[in-house]
């Protein structure tokens, strides 16, 4: 038994020894390293799987094992360990090799077999590919193992090797263990693969991958190709991963460091202080030069900017040290900076936290040499210097035994000393010594042992007691006088800087600099360490010998201390000046107090200006030694500053001051670069809070304005990046388990056992798990609280001790929570979505790059919503409406769509604009606010889209914000609106309408039933029959129900087998036996068996019957089934044909229904029109058509004058012809022809080829504008009409000659301005053609086309920049007359039909008015009142003409009255001598002749303003009214006057008072006012009474009238006055007006009647039929009584009047008497009136005209004329006058701009009354005559009227659209030679060119025509200056 026991003990011990042996441990760690998989396994796996042949596999395995063996050997062998076992060396080796490998194997040139044929040899070992496989596996095995799990397992071998003694055996065993593990791993992998191949179930399951697998097996090349690609991708990923482990030195941000160069003034020697070493200390030294008496600083600092470029670039990116090249790439600071930064608010730089004042070094400790961490670097450097410079025997290295012996000896000596001291103290106490100081015996510094003189107690370094104190920093003594002066000045500077420290920071910095310079000087003179000169390398040996001879080595330290003490005393005891007594006192005190070192025999004498004189011999020796050795030798520079810097070690600081983002944002950082911050601040947002007082404060308050509060808001979540330095490397904690955004105590689970208290880790983990189940939070809430309490009770520390404190703390917490809850509840009551919104906003800020992604998604959703989704919804909705035969609402929907605007907002929702983005929106975030979001409506109610509803919607704040999902929300980050508003707005009205219809249908059904019941109820027979049928039906229904119930019961009984097979029960009395109980049991069993058998039998029979039925059905098919099968087959065969036909049928049906929608809608409209109105409309339309047909026939029969000019074409036809023109890109041809390299003969050939091809019709190429219009027109389908439609628009003979220009030989533009006798346009054979026919020749009037537009002329005449004179081809003149077409725009050649002037044209077209020369009046709404004030304010006449003709010309102002100021119209008629009837006189178009001598007028005189024209005869008022009513009756007078004679308008009225002095005008006005003061005094009394009457009349008229307008009647008066009239001319005017009128009515009464009549009834335009006898036209005055009587007669309210009196007779009789003018008469919609006029003779017909609102007439008129007034040089200016009118604006006033409040007018005068007309006209005349001689009137510039924003856009558009006018096309049609004439437009005045370029004048009628065409409207509601093409006024060459 004992033997067995010992055996077991030996076995156990043996096992323990074996386990603890090096071999087993090595095998264990080797097995662990097999699980550390690195990138080399990829190469080995590739060789085993993909490579063919055993050679490559063997080479791969061999290389893999060899590499691992080298790694194990590197653990033991130091050189290999340094080369391979360091991470940075492995990284440096791995990255280049991986890159080369990737390039080499991906290039096909290297991998091609033919290319590698030279490298491959016969033997396998010499094969290059096999060698590459071996090297790859060998080298990649040396890399870091990072795949599974990490490199930690592989490094465990290195760690354990330090613990074992037999290292070689450990390495060998670990390698064997790794090899065994590697072999086992590959064998296991092979077995797994074999098992997968053999296991059929695993291979069969993925059936869907079988085809892919077969394809791979068939195509072996595909396998190798994709396998290589995958492998190369893995290689490049490994390369990136390894490269990501190290920071990039070239891309990291580096702090700015500047090298400073200091220059000395004395010797010119330079001393550089560059970048510091690893500690990074950089000091700027300012040295004070020697030899300056006044203490001036001679040194100058320079920043080295002009250094070498290469060195500066290298210094910017690298910290290069040639001695330490490894630190270049592997800096412990990770290239540039640490991880964190501790700020320092002082001036000094911050501390370096990762550096310590201690480091590792060897030192003797406890008798042995050990590594000590608490070893200061200054001591080590000092000791190294001593070892280098002093070869003492004590510095030899001792053995370990010697060190230990010395240590033991010193310790014994110390213990003995302590024992002795303790014994001495006890003995002193026993002796009862009085002196208690014996207990505190200390060693003191003694000067001499014999005298025993000690240093003072405060300065004794060995004294430890109450007298010990720190010595202040002092400055050493300089033996030279100059150095002493410098020290004195530096000390004075220091004192002054200390005094000014509190006042300014700059003084403090300068004082600190002075202190540093003085300190550096002391270092240079003496040195820091007191034995510094001994340790310097440049000290010769003779100095040491002298030192040994003169001094005793034992007292060296004491003597040096005395010397420094003396130097300190002498320095601070110096005298500044001879009269400073305070300095003497302080000096004496210092000497008496501090010079106790020396004996009484020593004499120290300090003389003024001579420094310190020492009489003692020892003192002299000290001084001489210091002067020779320790003093600074400026010639030799014996002091090594680098060694001093090493010795003077301080606390390590950063060489820079890093600033954070917040400091830089708030201006604390003085650097200018906004991106030059080094520290990451916490995520914050700056919010400016505006106080309510500032918003509610008025601007007029004098109180101080409250300032805005600048507040920084931090998110509630944590930010781990705060206070981290930019570019620093973070700690890669790959083993930390992170499961939440903010996690406390982040540690790896592997180190939980090392934590003191790791219970909180599990607590957090449990809490997080519980938080995951938020949906079931209510269920487990109690359980969670219980667990938390249990954990706290079990693991909390010191609960019992601090229970009371915790209780109070809990109460406080409860109160806080209650307060927080109350606050949250209050906030949630205001905004319930506040907390979720805050959470979502913070969530977007937490995630990295979330704001960038969110911003891009929002912009994408905004674009899709705006441009894709909404237009698609609109189109789908309108298509549905069209399919339902309803009118489409595209216009209304797109109008609502245009109102929606997307505004960019900040992250908080503050809107900015639609185009501007917030600053840093990609980083800080963005919101998109949708204003007036689009809501799709099923139909538009007419009143819903009114302005009032829109204003209500604006007041409600109809807006929303866009979410990431594309939905709408009320607030940023709020909940989405559900249901979507677009669908709700669309379907909700539909459902409501359906509900209404359903209700109505129910009501209708109920009513119908009720009606039927009432009808049936009326007959007794039917009532009886109905009762019988009801009774019978009820009885029959009951019987049917009862029968069904019986059938169900029978069926249930038959189905139940138990009830169906029941036996007949027998009585127990009949059967009786003793064993009755047994027999009953047997009977029951038998019954059950029989029941089961019967049930089984029945089931078998049922199944057999069903099978038979199925067989029969399969064999025999009925005829119906066969027929159905045949039909089905036939349908399947013909299905495609049916589908095609069905689709075509649907298509045609839809197409025709769409076409017929308009026709059907017209039918629907006609249904609602009463029959009576329809009958009345038809004859009216019939008469109009008949009149038109007669006109066409008359024109065709009688050779009417048809002008072949382009101006007579309609706009639609022009665009049609443009679309037919062959499109060709002529811009390239222009560039070809303009290229100078092409020979001249080739250019002509190219041009000829263009002509033959029909590309061009002229020698010059057309401009590209036509091509642009053609492209635009071809994209619009509304001009793609059929030929029949185009043939209706224009006669065929017009179209045949459109492409051809009118050929005219010897045409010259100059002839227009020369004598009229030489006019070449006159054709002698056709002189009489030009005469306009009289009233008998009305049917010969010209053909009129009123649908053309100026836009068409722009398109056609883009090539024709010259004037078109085709109108002159059909007109001729007398030799003494000159015809000038006023309505031709010479700049573009756009003549207008003369029918517009004569008023004898066709019926006016009211939808699109014919183009007029200067203005489109439909876009301006004038008031309808024709007051004399309004019209005379608008038009004034200058009659002061010296060149009046012999005829007496009556000139009138625009007025309806017959007073002195009669009306002047442009339509002037002569009385024919033969017929004595009025005919048209064209002399009014004659250009007036002017005298050159009288040409000194203002700027606008050249335009033809302010002059009168001579007219022979003016027709009577009725004829004029009739002629003018054909155009626009509401503004006919003014419009006609302006259209033909724009010079009738006063220039002063247009330009107002631009540059005149108001004082001069007022002075002249006063003179005139004095003369008329007497007249005005008489009229003042009458005026007041008349004003009240007028106001009452106007109120009555406005309330009763059909047109109630709210426009302002205020006009813009001006101080410019019209010129005065001569008295003779007044008399002529009065005579002519008396002759032209047959009736006279007083002006006041007639004015009132006219106003009332026009305001009441002017709603229709009345016209006469041309075929009516002209004798009916009255020539007398209007009888207003007849008008009123007719209106009363035809009123519906008085039917008796119509029956009693025949209205036809009354109308005809009044018209013949001249008492009725149909042109002014406007009828009310009365059927009888229409019947009267259209029943028989068709005398007149009515046309509705547009009713205009009452706007500010004068103001709009002034704007219109001011913009649209074209310079009339072609009307008035002759070539001979141009030389004298070179300047149109003065240079002095060129830069003068009109202020905004004076753009339109500078005067705010009240509107004068009718009685003030005469006075006002006189003022205007006087002012005009004064200003007529001045030549400094400024140009009329549209920018003066526009706002500043519109000015800028106007200039931009002008510059973009302006073209070079040099390449104007020339055509032989107009001229055969170059035209050398220079118009006024081409005046070579640089000032005018500049003005016309900056402020081009644009024509308002062009804009109006564009408006009419683009928007198909007649009003000016959509008129916009931004959507138009602006035309320049002048052609600047």
Curated annotation (Swiss-Prot):
<comment type="similarity">
    <text>Belongs to the TIC214 family.</text>
</comment>
<feature type="transmembrane region" description="Helical">
    <location>
        <begin position="1135"/>
        <end position="1155"/>
    </location>
</feature>
<feature type="compositionally biased region" description="Polar residues">
    <location>
        <begin position="476"/>
        <end position="487"/>
    </location>
</feature>
<keyword id="KW-0812">Transmembrane</keyword>
<keyword id="KW-0150">Chloroplast</keyword>
<keyword id="KW-0934">Plastid</keyword>
<feature type="transmembrane region" description="Helical">
    <location>
        <begin position="18"/>
        <end position="38"/>
    </location>
</feature>
<feature type="region of interest" description="Disordered">
    <location>
        <begin position="808"/>
        <end position="832"/>
    </location>
</feature>
<keyword id="KW-0813">Transport</keyword>
<comment type="subunit">
    <text>Part of the Tic complex.</text>
</comment>
<feature type="region of interest" description="Disordered">
    <location>
        <begin position="266"/>
        <end position="291"/>
    </location>
</feature>
<keyword id="KW-0653">Protein transport</keyword>
<comment type="function">
    <text>Involved in protein precursor import into chloroplasts. May be part of an intermediate translocation complex acting as a protein-conducting channel at the inner envelope.</text>
</comment>
<keyword id="KW-1133">Transmembrane helix</keyword>
<dbReference type="GO" id="GO:0009706">
    <property type="term" value="C:chloroplast inner membrane"/>
</dbReference>
<protein>
    <recommendedName>
        <fullName>Protein TIC 214</fullName>
    </recommendedName>
</protein>
<feature type="region of interest" description="Disordered">
    <location>
        <begin position="1066"/>
        <end position="1121"/>
    </location>
</feature>
<feature type="transmembrane region" description="Helical">
    <location>
        <begin position="230"/>
        <end position="250"/>
    </location>
</feature>
<dbReference type="GO" id="GO:0015031">
    <property type="term" value="P:protein transport"/>
</dbReference>
<feature type="region of interest" description="Disordered">
    <location>
        <begin position="473"/>
        <end position="514"/>
    </location>
</feature>
<feature type="compositionally biased region" description="Acidic residues">
    <location>
        <begin position="278"/>
        <end position="289"/>
    </location>
</feature>
<feature type="compositionally biased region" description="Basic and acidic residues">
    <location>
        <begin position="819"/>
        <end position="832"/>
    </location>
</feature>
<feature type="transmembrane region" description="Helical">
    <location>
        <begin position="60"/>
        <end position="80"/>
    </location>
</feature>
<dbReference type="Pfam" id="PF05758">
    <property type="entry name" value="Ycf1"/>
</dbReference>
<feature type="compositionally biased region" description="Basic and acidic residues">
    <location>
        <begin position="488"/>
        <end position="514"/>
    </location>
</feature>
<feature type="region of interest" description="Disordered">
    <location>
        <begin position="1562"/>
        <end position="1642"/>
    </location>
</feature>
<keyword id="KW-0472">Membrane</keyword>
<keyword id="KW-1001">Plastid inner membrane</keyword>
<dbReference type="InterPro" id="IPR008896">
    <property type="entry name" value="TIC214"/>
</dbReference>
<feature type="transmembrane region" description="Helical">
    <location>
        <begin position="87"/>
        <end position="107"/>
    </location>
</feature>
<feature type="compositionally biased region" description="Polar residues">
    <location>
        <begin position="1066"/>
        <end position="1078"/>
    </location>
</feature>
<feature type="compositionally biased region" description="Basic residues">
    <location>
        <begin position="1105"/>
        <end position="1115"/>
    </location>
</feature>
<feature type="transmembrane region" description="Helical">
    <location>
        <begin position="128"/>
        <end position="148"/>
    </location>
</feature>
<feature type="compositionally biased region" description="Basic and acidic residues">
    <location>
        <begin position="1564"/>
        <end position="1642"/>
    </location>
</feature>
<feature type="transmembrane region" description="Helical">
    <location>
        <begin position="176"/>
        <end position="196"/>
    </location>
</feature>
């Amino acid at each position: 038994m004992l033997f067995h026991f010992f055996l077991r003990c030996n076995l156990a011990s043996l096992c323990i020894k074996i386990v603890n042996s090096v071999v087993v441990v090595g095998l264990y760690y080797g097995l662990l390293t097999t699980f550390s998989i690195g990138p080399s396994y990829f190469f080995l796996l590739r060789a085993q799987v993909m490579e063919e042949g055993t050679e490559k596999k063997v080479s791969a395995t061999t290389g893999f094992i060899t590499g691992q063996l080298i790694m194990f050997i590197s653990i033991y062998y130091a050189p290999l360990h340094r080369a391979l076992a360091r991470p940075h060396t492995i990284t440096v080796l791995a990255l280049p090799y991986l890159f080369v490998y990737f390039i080499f194997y991906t290039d096909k040139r290297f991998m091609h077999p033919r290319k590698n044929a030279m490298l491959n040899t016969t033997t396998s070992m010499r094969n290059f590919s096999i060698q590459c496989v071996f090297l790859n596996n060998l080298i990649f095995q040396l890399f870091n193992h990072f795949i599974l799990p990490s490199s930690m397992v592989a490094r465990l071998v290195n760690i354990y090797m330090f613990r074992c003694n037999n290292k070689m055996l450990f390495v060998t065993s670990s390698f064997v263990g790794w090899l065994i593990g590697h072999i086992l791993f590959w064998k296991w992998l092979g077995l797994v693969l074999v098992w997968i191949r053999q296991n059929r179930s695993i291979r069969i399951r993925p059936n869907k991958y079988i085809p892919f697998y077969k394809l791979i097996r068939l195509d072996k090349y595909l396998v190798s190709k994709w396998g290589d690609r995958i492998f190369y991708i893995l290689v490049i990923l490994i390369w990136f991963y390894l490269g990501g482990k190290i920071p990039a030195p070239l891309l990291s941000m580096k702090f700015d460091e500047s090298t400073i160069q200091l220059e000395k003034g004395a010797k010119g020697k330079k001393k550089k202080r560059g970048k510091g070493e690893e500690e990074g200390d950089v000091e700027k030294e300012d040295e004070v030069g020697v030899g300056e008496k006044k203490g001036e600083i001679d040194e100058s600092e320079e920043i080295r900017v002009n250094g070498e470029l290469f060195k500066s670039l290298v210094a910017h990116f690298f910290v290069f040290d040639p001695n330490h090249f490894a630190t270049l790439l592997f800096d412990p600071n990770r290239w540039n900076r640490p991880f964190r930064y501790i700020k320092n608010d002082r001036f000094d730089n911050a501390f370096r936290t990762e550096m310590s004042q201690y480091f590792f070094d060897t030192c003797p400790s406890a008798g042995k040499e050990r590594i000590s961490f608490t070893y200061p670097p200054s001591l080590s450097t000092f000791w190294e210097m001593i070892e280098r410079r002093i070869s003492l025997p004590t510095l030899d290295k001792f053995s370990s035994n010697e060190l230990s012996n010395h240590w033991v000896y010193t310790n014994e000596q110390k213990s003995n000393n302590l024992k002795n001291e303790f014994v001495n103290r006890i003995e002193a106490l026993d002796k009862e010594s009085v002196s208690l100081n014996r207990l505190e015996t200390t060693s003191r510094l003694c000067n001499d042992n014999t005298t025993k003189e000690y240093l003072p107690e405060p300065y004794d370094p060995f004294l430890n007691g109450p007298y010990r104190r720190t010595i202040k920093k002092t400055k050493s003594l300089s033996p030279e006088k100059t150095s002493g002066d410098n020290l004195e000045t530096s000390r004075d500077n220091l004192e002054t800087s200390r005094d000014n420290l509190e006042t300014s920071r700059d003084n403090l910095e300068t004082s600190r600099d002075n202190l540093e310079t003085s300190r550096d000087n002391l270092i240079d003179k003496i040195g820091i360490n007191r034995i510094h000169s001994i340790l310097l390398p440049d000290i010769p040996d003779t100095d040491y010998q002298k030192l040994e001879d003169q001094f005793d080595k034992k007292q060296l330290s004491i003597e040096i201390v005395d010397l420094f003490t003396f130097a300190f005393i002498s320095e601070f005891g110096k005298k500044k000046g001879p009269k400073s007594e305070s300095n003497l006192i302080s000096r004496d005190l210092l000497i008496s107090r501090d010079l106790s070192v020396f004996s009484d025999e020593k004499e120290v004498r300090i003389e003024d200006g001579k420094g310190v004189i020492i009489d003692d011999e020892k003192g002299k020796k000290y001084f001489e030694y210091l002067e020779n050795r320790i003093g600074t030798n400026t010639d030799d520079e014996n002091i090594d500053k680098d060694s001093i810097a090493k010795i003077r070690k301080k606390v390590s600081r950063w060489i820079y001051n890093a600033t954070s983002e917040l400091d830089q944002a708030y201006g604390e950082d003085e650097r200018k670069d906004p991106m030059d911050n080094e520290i990451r601040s916490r995520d914050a947002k700056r919010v400016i809070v505006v106080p309510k007082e500032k918003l509610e404060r008025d601007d007029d308050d004098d109180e101080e304005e409250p300032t805005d509060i600048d507040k920084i808001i931090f998110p509630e979540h944590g930010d781990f990046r705060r206070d981290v330095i930019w570019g620093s490397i973070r700690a890669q904690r790959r083993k930390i388990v992170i499961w939440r955004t903010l996690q406390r105590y982040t540690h790896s689970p592997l180190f939980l056992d090392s934590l003191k208290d790791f219970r909180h880790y599990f607590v957090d983990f449990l809490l997080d798990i519980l938080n995951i189940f938020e949906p079931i939070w209510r269920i487990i809430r109690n359980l969670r609280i219980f667990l938390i309490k249990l954990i706290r009770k079990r693991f909390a520390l010191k609960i019992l001790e601090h229970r009371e404190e915790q209780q109070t703390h809990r109460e406080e917490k409860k109160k806080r929570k209650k307060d927080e809850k109350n606050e949250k509840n209050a906030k949630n009551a205001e905004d319930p979505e506040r907390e979720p919104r805050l959470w979502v906003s913070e969530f977007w800020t937490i995630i990295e790059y979330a704001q960038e992604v969110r911003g891009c998604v929002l912009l994408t959703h905004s674009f899709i919503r705006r441009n894709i989704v909404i237009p698609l919804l609109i189109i789908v909705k309108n298509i549905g409406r069209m399919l339902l035969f309803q009118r489409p609402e595209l216009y209304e929907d797109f109008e609502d769509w245009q109102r929606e605007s997307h505004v960019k907002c900040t992250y908080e929702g503050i809107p900015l604009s639609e185009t501007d983005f917030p600053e840093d929106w990609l980083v800080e975030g963005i919101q998109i606010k949708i204003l007036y979001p689009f809501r799709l409506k099923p139909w538009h109610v007419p009143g819903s889209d009114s302005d009032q509803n829109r204003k209500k919607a604006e007041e409600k704040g109809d807006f929303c914000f866009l979410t990431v999902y594309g939905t709408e929300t009320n607030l940023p980050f709020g909940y989405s609106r559900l249901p979507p508003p677009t669908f709700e707005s669309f379907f909700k009205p539909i459902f409501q309408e359906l509900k209404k219809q359903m209700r109505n249908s129910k009501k209708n059904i109920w009513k119908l039933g009720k009606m039927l019941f009432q009808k049936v109820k009326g007959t007794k027979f039917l009532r009886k029959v109905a009762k019988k049928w009801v009774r019978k039906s009820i009885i029959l229904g009951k019987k049917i129900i009862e029968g069904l119930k019986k059938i169900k019961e029978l069926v249930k009984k038959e189905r139940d087998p138990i009830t169906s097979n029941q036996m007949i029960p027998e009585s127990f009395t009949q059967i009786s036996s003793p064993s009755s109980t047994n027999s009953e049991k047997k009977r029951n069993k038998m019954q059950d068996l029989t029941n089961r058998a019967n049930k089984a039998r029945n089931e078998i029979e049922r199944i057999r019957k069903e099978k038979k039925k199925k067989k029969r059905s399969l064999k025999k098919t009925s005829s119906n089934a066969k027929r159905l099968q045949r039909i089905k087959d036939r349908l399947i065969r013909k299905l495609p044909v049916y589908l095609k036909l069905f689709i075509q049928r649907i298509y045609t049906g839809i197409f025709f229904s769409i076409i017929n929608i308009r026709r059907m809608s017209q039918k629907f409209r006609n249904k609602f029109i009463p029959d009576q109105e329809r009958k009345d409309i038809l004859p009216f339309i019939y008469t109009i058509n008949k009149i038109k047909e007669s006109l066409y026939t008359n024109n065709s029969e009688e050779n009417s004058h048809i002008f072949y000019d382009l101006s007579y074409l309609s706009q639609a036809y022009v665009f049609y012809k443009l679309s037919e023109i062959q499109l060709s890109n002529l811009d390239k041809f222009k560039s070809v022809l303009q290229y100078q390299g092409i020979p001249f003969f080739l250019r002509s050939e190219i041009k000829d080829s263009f002509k033959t091809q029909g590309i061009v019709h002229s020698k010059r190429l057309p401009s590209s504008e036509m091509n642009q219009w053609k492209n635009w027109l071809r994209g619009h389908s509304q001009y793609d009409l059929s030929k029949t439609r185009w043939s209706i628009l224009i006669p065929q003979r017009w179209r045949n000659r459109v492409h051809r220009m009118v050929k005219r030989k010897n045409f010259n533009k100059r002839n227009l301005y020369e004598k009229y006798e030489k006019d070449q346009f006159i054709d002698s054979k056709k002189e009489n053609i030009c005469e306009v026919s009289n009233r008998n020749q009305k049917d010969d009037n010209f053909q009129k086309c009123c649908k053309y537009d100026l836009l068409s002329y722009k398109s056609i005449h883009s090539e024709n920049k010259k004037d078109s004179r085709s109108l002159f081809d059909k007109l001729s003149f007398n030799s003494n007359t000159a015809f000038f077409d006023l309505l031709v725009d010479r700049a573009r050649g756009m003549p207008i039909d003369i029918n517009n002037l004569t008023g004898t044209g066709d019926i006016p077209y009211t939808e699109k008015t014919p183009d007029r020369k200067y203005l489109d009046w439909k876009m301006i709404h004038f008031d309808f009142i024709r007051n004399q004030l309004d019209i005379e304010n608008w038009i004034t006449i200058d009659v002061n003409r010296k060149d009046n003709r012999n005829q007496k010309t009556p000139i009138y102002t625009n007025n309806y009255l017959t007073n002195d100021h009669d009306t002047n119209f442009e339509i002037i008629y002569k009385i024919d001598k033969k017929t004595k009837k009025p005919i048209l006189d064209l002399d009014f178009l004659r250009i007036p002749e002017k005298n050159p001598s009288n040409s000194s007028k203002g700027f606008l005189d050249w335009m033809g303003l302010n002059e009168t024209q001579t007219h022979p005869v003016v027709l009577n008022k009725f004829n004029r009214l009739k002629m003018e009513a054909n155009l626009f009756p509401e503004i006919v007078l003014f419009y006609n006057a302006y259209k033909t004679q724009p010079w009738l308008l006063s220039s002063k009225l247009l330009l107002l008072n631009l540059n005149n002095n108001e004082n001069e005008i007022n002075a002249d006005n006063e003179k005139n006012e004095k003369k008329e003061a007497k007249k005005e005094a008489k009229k003042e009394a009458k005026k007041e009474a008349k004003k009240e009457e007028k106001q009452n009349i106007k109120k009555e008229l406005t309330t009763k009238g059909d047109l109630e307008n709210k426009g302002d009647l205020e006009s813009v008066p001006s101080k410019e006055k019209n010129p005065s009239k001569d008295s003779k001319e007044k008399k002529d005017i009065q005579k002519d007006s008396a002759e032209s009128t047959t009736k006279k009515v007083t002006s006041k009464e007639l004015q009132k009647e006219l106003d009332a009549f026009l305001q009441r009834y002017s709603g229709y335009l009345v016209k006469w039929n041309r075929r009516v006898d002209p004798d009916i036209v009255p020539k007398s005055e209007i009888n207003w009584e007849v008008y009123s009587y007719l209106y009363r007669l035809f009123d519906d309210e008085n039917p008796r009047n119509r029956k009693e009196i025949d209205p036809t007779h009354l109308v005809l009789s009044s018209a013949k008497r001249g008492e009725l003018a149909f042109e002014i008469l406007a009828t009310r919609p009365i059927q009888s009136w229409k019947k009267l006029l259209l029943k028989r003779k068709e005398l007149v017909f009515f046309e509705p005209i547009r009713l205009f609102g009452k706007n500010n007439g004068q103001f709009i008129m002034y704007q219109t004329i001011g913009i649209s007034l074209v310079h009339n040089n072609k009307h008035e200016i002759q070539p001979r006058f141009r030389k004298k009118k070179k300047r149109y604006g003065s240079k002095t006033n060129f830069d003068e701009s009109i202020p905004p409040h004076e753009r339109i007018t500078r005067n705010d005068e009240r509107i004068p009354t009718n009685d003030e007309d005469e006075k006002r006209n006189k003022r205007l005349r006087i002012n005009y005559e004064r200003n007529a001689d001045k030549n400094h009137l400024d140009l009329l510039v549209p920018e003066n009227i526009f706002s500043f924003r519109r000015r800028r856009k106007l200039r931009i558009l002008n510059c973009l659209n302006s073209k070079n006018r040099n390449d104007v096309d020339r055509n032989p049609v107009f001229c055969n030679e170059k035209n050398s004439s220079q118009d006024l437009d081409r005046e070579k005045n640089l000032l005018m060119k500049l003005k016309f370029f900056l402020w081009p004048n644009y024509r308002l009628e062009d804009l109006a025509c564009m408006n009419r065409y683009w928007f198909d409207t007649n009003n000016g509601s959509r008129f916009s200056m931004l959507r138009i093409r602006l035309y320049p006024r002048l052609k600047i060459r």
